[in-house]
Amino acid sequence: MTQPNLNIVPFVSVDHMMKLVLRVGVETFLKELAGYVEEDFRRWQNFDKTPRVASHSKEGVIELMPTSDGTLYGFKYVNGHPKNTRDGLQTVTAFGVLANVGSGYPMLLTEMTILTALRTAATSAVAAKHLAPKNARTMAIIGNGAQSEFQALAFKAILGVDKLRLYDLDPQATAKCIRNLQGAGFDIVACKSVEEAVEGADIITTVTADKANATILTDNMVGAGVHINAVGGDCPGKTELHGDILRRSDIFVEYPPQTRIEGEIQQLPEDYPVNELWEVITGRIAGRKDARQITLFDSVGFATEDFSALRYVRDKLKDTGLYEQLDLLADPDEPRDLYGMLLRHEKLLQSESTKPAA
């Protein structure tokens, strides 16, 4: 991917993103993206970190997620509106920008609705690689909406999970998930309750959408030795797990100041001890210590993961042509003459309007 004129910014549309993902292959894309996510967790201390800037309403939330490693800057605009599906709209939509810190000029503008689904699943699988039981093959997925297939494929690509136990309040959502994963190499069981779904599961993924303090999992459903991948709780007042599960588990988070506001641990005292995922990945602390330990990844999504996704797409776009050249920036030849640029364009328009018709 080249950027010959600084005023021209490569733009990846939804169509181009889908073509890129399919050209690479979904599982390969997830595996390679997970590598970028893990690489950036390993250099965690290089990043400028802040909780996302959120605007909450009774309908949902709109957020900005910025971060920088000192060389590149990235941000994502993302919403979360659980009731949107009732109107035929997506629960989550997003776009993102990658920029050069030295000049402040953007280098990439891309859709991130599809990319966020991929990066969320890739991050969950990275965490599970360090926290799940060894040789885990069976995963329960509670909530079979837009994120469920991505989670399944990421865990297959990165951990070798090949048995799925699915449950959703809406049987049509489960049927959709099964239909979409046909031929992907899974042994799938559609379950009639959460209790049935978690039976025999090594990994339990909760990925529901309702903006409420729900109790998707209760303490009696969680046996020793499992890994819980809690994805659905991602804003104040939205949780999925009973508090007793948290107190039995070793909890791992992305960025504590954000997770204490938005994650499952919002149910616990502010000083409740948690572990940071980057410290596990870098070997500073242990992840899974024994076979009976319950590990919990309290996932809310953090800006460094979007940064990783933006870096990956930038690198993957090279020589593909899967982007448009967007005339985004007013960049006059004389930087101090922005108004003159406007006047010159006016003259150009006038000359074009007076040209005789061919």
Curated annotation (Swiss-Prot):
Cofactor: NAD(+)
SUPFAM superfamilies from the UniProt entry: NAD(P)-binding Rossmann-fold domains
Entries under Pfam families matching the protein: OCD_Mu_crystall
InterPro entries per the UniProt record, alphabetical: NAD(P)-bd_dom_sf, ODC_Mu_crystall, ODC_N
Gene3D superfamilies: NAD(P)-binding Rossmann-like Domain (3.40.50.720), ornithine cyclodeaminase, domain 1 (3.30.1780.10)
Plastid among keywords: no
Binding site for L-ornithine: 52, 76, 119, 234, 300
Gene Ontology biological-process entries: arginine metabolic process; L-proline biosynthetic process
Keywords assigned: Arginine metabolism, Lyase, NAD
Binding site for NAD(+): 91, 119, 146-147, 168, 208, 231-234, 238, 299
Pathway: Amino-acid biosynthesis; L-proline biosynthesis; L-proline from L-ornithine: step 1/1
Coiled coil: none
Reaction catalysed by this enzyme: L-ornithine = L-proline + NH4(+)
Keyword Ubl conjugation: no
Top-level EC class: lyase
List of catalytic residues: 234 (proton donor/acceptor)
EC number(s) stated in the UniProt entry for this protein: 4.3.1.12
Recorded family membership: Belongs to the ornithine cyclodeaminase/mu-crystallin family.
Name of protein: Ornithine cyclodeaminase
Species name: Brucella suis biovar 1 (strain 1330)
Upper lineage: Bacteria, Pseudomonadati, Pseudomonadota, Alphaproteobacteria, Hyphomicrobiales
